[in-house]
Amino acid sequence: MIQKNWQELIKPEKLQVNPGHDPKRFATVIAEPLERGFGMTLGNALRRILLSSLQGAAVTSIHIDGVLHEFSSIPGVREDVTDIILNVKDVAIRMQGDGPKRMVAKKTGPGVLLAGDIQTVGDVAILNPNLPICTLDEGAELRIEFTVDTGKGYVAADRNRPEDAPIGLIPIDSLYSPVRKVSYKVENTREGQILDYDKLTLQIETNGSITAEDALAYAARILQDQLEIFVNFEEPKRESETTAIQTLPFSPALLKKVDELELSVRSANCLKNDNIVYIGDLIQKSETEMLRTPNFGRKSLNEIKEVLASLGLHLGMEVPGWPPENIEELAKRFEEHY
């Protein structure tokens, strides 16, 4: 009976995801209903993980031709090096592989050096190419080399300085997290006649390297992984579910819908037009019956026979107890068993 501790708690069946004005960067996610107190517990934990623990990419150091340290000024460049560093920290980067990787930006004045002027390499992409880095006057020339790496959270500049750092290498603070802002609120919601359940609303903004919905999924997976060590027992399978499988007069695989068989469009449409919804419906048909279906030919027949054979099934089978009265409920219940 220990499983009642978690099985009888109410939980949301599906998340409601509302994209913002930029679906790649913004989303509002609503989870309801939750047991009283779980909204605050989950909201706070997910927010902390979103801001601190997701992998991302960032600039770790820069090297500017003719500059020895961050307190220098550059002839013909309106910003000093400290201002340039502040702007570089805001460059949003997506990098699929491992680092570090080096990129270069060159500019001749007059004009503004933008993040999009950085010459990317390999799988590196600049997500905010219109971000200004510095402004050059007439006749000024500038070359900056950027070192990019992957990591998580915030890393201070002193930790980004390699032991063999060359003269002129300027390490900078790195904010690897792809999540820029997270806020949440907990409100009352109802389930049936009970009014004191929690409704959790999360508002998430990313830098565009991942979607807000994916960021939340990764954060939830991290939390799940961290909690697994605290579970010191094997969860017994639900007795009712085991009994139901044993008493089912046919294989649960027959409850799978035929549109999940990855058939050709022609074959799938023929089955749909003949009101064949489940595999259990299909295997009871004979070859002759199938060939009577409009637009259904030998090619489609052979395709279906091949797919059924891969499942250990064939046309013309007898299925006792088919179709069950509650077929839709059974299909949903036994989905994980086929």
UniProtKB/Swiss-Prot annotation:
One of its GO terms (molecular function) is DNA binding. GO terms for biological process: DNA-templated transcription. It holds the Pfam family RNA_pol_A_CTD. GO terms for cellular component: cytoplasm; DNA-directed RNA polymerase complex. InterPro entries: DNA-dir_RNA_pol_insert (IPR011262), DNA-dir_RNA_pol_RpoA/D/Rpb3 (IPR011263), DNA-dir_RpoA (IPR011773), RBP11-like (IPR036603), RNAP_asu_C (IPR011260), RNApol_insert_sf (IPR036643). It comes from the Bacteria. Residues 1-234 are annotated as: Alpha N-terminal domain (alpha-NTD). Residues 250-338 are annotated as: Alpha C-terminal domain (alpha-CTD). The keyword Signal does not apply. Its EC number is 2.7.7.6. The N-terminal domain is essential for RNAP assembly and basal transcription, whereas the C-terminal domain is involved in interaction with transcriptional regulators and with upstream promoter elements. NCBIfam families: PRK05182.1-2, PRK05182.2-5, rpoA. This is DNA-directed RNA polymerase subunit alpha. It comes from Xanthobacter autotrophicus (strain ATCC BAA-1158 / Py2).
